[in-house]
Amino acid sequence: MAKKVTAVIKLALQAGKANPAPPVGPALGQHGVNIMAFCKEYNARTQDKAGFVIPVEISVFEDRSFTFITKTPPASVLIVKAAGIEKGSGESAKGSVGSITRAQLEEIANTKLPDLNCSSVESAMRIIEGTARNMGVAVKD
């Protein structure tokens, strides 16, 4: 029989840099999870994605064991990195703070495709383009 899930915890952590300090320790500790085991496993799985924030969804079971799924980095982080800017615009309607090419947009869409609620790369590109526009980043042909 399958183990019963008692909690699902969602965190966004730096790739390869999870440690027992907040927010990881308190979030997992209250469910009785072995914090160091999670940190070691998460760091091992994400060490090749250094520099990105990687969202993770942790399922905690009755016997205090756990499994977790790592997601792709947030679209905004990928857009900022591609545009080579520090952060998006506070007032996106007034002007752009940077730009990305269609090729970069397609690359980001391909990266995000497994986590987006769509099936084609074209629709993923439209979603990412909307995110970029809201951040004040122009998409150039």
Curated annotation (Swiss-Prot):
Keywords: Methylation, Ribonucleoprotein, Ribosomal protein, RNA-binding, rRNA-binding. CDD domains: Ribosomal_L11. Signal peptide: none annotated. It comes from the Bacteria. GO terms for molecular function: large ribosomal subunit rRNA binding; structural constituent of ribosome. GO terms for cellular component: cytosolic large ribosomal subunit. One or more lysine residues are methylated. The keyword Cell division does not apply. Transmembrane segments: none annotated. GO terms for biological process: translation. Part of the ribosomal stalk of the 50S ribosomal subunit. Interacts with L10 and the large rRNA to form the base of the stalk. L10 forms an elongated spine to which L12 dimers bind in a sequential fashion forming a multimeric L10(L12)X complex. Forms part of the ribosomal stalk which helps the ribosome interact with GTP-bound translation factors. Belongs to the universal ribosomal protein uL11 family. This is Large ribosomal subunit protein uL11.
